[in-house]
Structures are given as structure tokens and as C-alpha cells.
Amino acid sequence: MATPVGTALTAEPESTAQRARRARIIQATLALASRGGYEAVQMREVAERSEVALGTLYRYFPSKVHLLVSAMAHELERMRVRLQRKAIPGDTRQERVSYVLERSTHSLQRDPNLTEALVRAMMAADATVADEVTGVRNQMADLIIQAMREGEAPTEEDEAYAGILQDVWFARQIAWLGGRISSEAIWDDIEQAIALVLRD
């Protein structure tokens, strides 16, 4: 279901040097976003920090939104790798999905500036970034499916449920960043959604 990072998000680098360059760009982006949020990520500074020409940066990522959405994909991929290191705790799919989404939420809340930059980019994305945004949403849905199915192939119903829950998860992050709900309320809402959608 998910689009592998580096394919739909941008053209897959073909050489070791290109892969290293792309990694430096993403790391520079994450550092700037963590320091000052969305506004702190300026393409020229990203190019300088990652030691690439500005034109090269734009060939990889046509805009700041493309860049930050790709950085979001990178963070979700890191999360997926961490979750695969051991069995996800929980005797039911509700418990396992709750664990995954709680970990995901807490991971974002530890760095509000970075979260603001990544989620704001998702909100600002227009039709030119549609494939990238879809890829990120699919990654989040796949994390949920991973918890639901424990390695088994998902059903169409599983994919529909995961889509609903990732929509709720993203919506609650947006509300939190906008100051409309507290961090505690985020989790209350997500837990309620899990209970309603996944009735074991």
C-alpha cells in the first residue's frame, strides 16, 4: 500500500553519491525545521547546509513543500523500522494500533517545531505534491495495518479502517498545532476513534 520513500516522493537516486546527497538534504531540512519550524526551512540555507548547489536542490525537490513532505516520509520510515525491531505490544488489534499511534504522537510532540513544519507542509500541499502526500498518508496507514495484522496480508476492510484512523491522526495533529486542543485531548480523540473503528 505504501509508496517506498524515494520513489513517488522524488525520482529514485541512481548512484551512491546521489543517495548520499539526498540524505544530506533531508537531514539539513530536519535540522532547520527542528530549530525554527516551517519558516526556518529556506531552500538556500538547506542547499548550503547540505553542500549542494541551489539548482541541484531544486532538481531533487521543486519546492519547500516537496522537501518537507519528503522529510515527513523519512520520519515515518524511521518509525516503521523501529517498530519492526520487535513484536508490537498488545493482545488485540485495538491495543496494538493504540500503541503505534501513541508512539507516533509522542514522537512528534517531543519536537513541536519539527512537527509544525512537517504538518504545515502537508496542509500547504497543492495538486503538484499530490503523489507525495498520498505516499505519506499510505505510509501512516501501513504503520496502522502493521499493528492490526501482525505480518498477515491486509483485507480491503483493514485498509479502509487504516485510512480512517490515519485521517483522524493527521487531523488531531493539525488541531494541536493550531492550539485548538491539548496534547491530552489528542490522545483521547484518537483512542475513541480506535475503539469505534476497531471493535474486536
Show which residues each predicted segment covers.
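Hydrophobic alpha-helical connector segments
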Residues: 70, 84-110, 161-165, 187
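Amphipathic alpha-helical packing segments from all-alpha helical-bundle domains
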Residues: 77-80, 126-152, 156-167, 184-196
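Helix-turn-helix
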Residues: 24, 32-66, 70
